[in-house]
């Protein structure tokens, strides 16, 4: 959730909303919980749009004009098709675990969502790995993408030690 505080800060300075695309329902709920820890003090309103929950309850949340929408790709597409959510005021788009979304076949849904948000926006793409599909998406849908790498691919963490314990089968 490296994007939580910068997102809240950015939205406090500008009009518009944030949109976070999460891979799973569980991740979407976790993101919402963490954002609310930071956002309560600024009266942050969120709407979580995930499968397995009532569309009607989600529509009620949307009507309260949330600052941030956190959604799984499929459920967001459902809301777009039913015209119950409007993304024209999205100023910050965050794709969390983009590599896994593409691995799981969500590329068509992601492209549909990217077409529904304004061209003038900040886009943040978070990925544990950076396969060519993710790089291609970044080049297609981002203006002047900047790659920030925590550690070069294939490097071991310095402070991690590994140990092997040999145990008998009966233990």
Regions found by a protein language model. Name each.
Residues 8, 28, 56, 77, ...:
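Nucleotide phosphate-binding site architecture
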Residues 32, 86-95, 99-157:
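Post-DEXD/H (motif II) to motif III coupling segment of the RecA-like Helicase ATP-binding lobe
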Residues 1, 55-58, 107-108:
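Switch II of P-loop NTPase G domains
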Residues 1-9, 16, 32:
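Motif I (Walker A/P-loop) of helicase-class P-loop NTPases
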Residues 167-171:
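Short, intrinsically disordered, charge-balanced linker/junction segments flanking boundaries
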Residues 13-81, 88-92, 135-139, 147-150, ...:
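Conserved nucleic-acid-binding Ia/Ib motif block in the N-terminal RecA-like helicase ATPase lobe
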